Amino acid sequence: MKNLITILALTSSVLAYSQSENNELKVNILYTALGAPELSYERILSDNSAIGASLAFSIDSKDNMDLRFGLTPYYRMFFGQKKAAGFFIEANTMFINYIDSISYSSNSSPTYNMKTGFGLGAAAGAKFLTKNNLIGEIYGGLGRVFGDNSIGAYPRFGITLGKRF
């Protein structure tokens, strides 16, 4: 039994060591400063492409920010010398929950009219990678929200810091 546990431990450590670093976790410090932290996970598919998803949520009071929740899956194509780094273009979708309007009455607290939308967009930016696999990104873009809504478009911008593992 001891030998089996030792073999399993050695095998799993060798397999874990040999796997390439194709995963990234990032935080958008710009959105965080604005009261809506955005966390992202990205999976590298090849030297020049990756897929990922960003999740933003509001921690601010409803009176100061319209965004309540946003989920943004994306695909990126890279044009740099390093693996999944350098200049990139991005195609994204967004599922968004936001405050459409606020109603006030004299005898009660405000009433928030919440809406949910779906949109498609594009962005461009640059990813910088250190030898220690620390990541810095800057990007910007815009998307169109479809359906009967009041916002019409959503921004896609950020300054992110993260780690590749």
Model-derived regions, located:
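Transmembrane beta-strand segments of Gram-negative outer membrane beta-barrel proteins
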Residues: Q19-I29, F87-T93
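A generic beta-sheet turn/junction motif
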Residues: S20, Y31-A33, K82, K163-F165
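Solvent-exposed loop/turn segments connecting transmembrane beta-strands
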Residues: K26-E38, S58-L67, K83, V145-Y154
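Gram-negative (and chloroplast) outer-membrane scaffold detector with strong preference
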Residues: E42-I138, R144
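Outer-membrane beta-barrel "beta-signal"
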Residues: M77, A153-F165
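Bacterial Sec-dependent N-terminal signal peptides
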Residues: M1-E21, F165
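Exposed loop/turn and edge beta-strand positions of beta-sandwich/beta-sheet ligand-binding modules
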Residues: E21-N23, G35, F69, F118-L120, ...
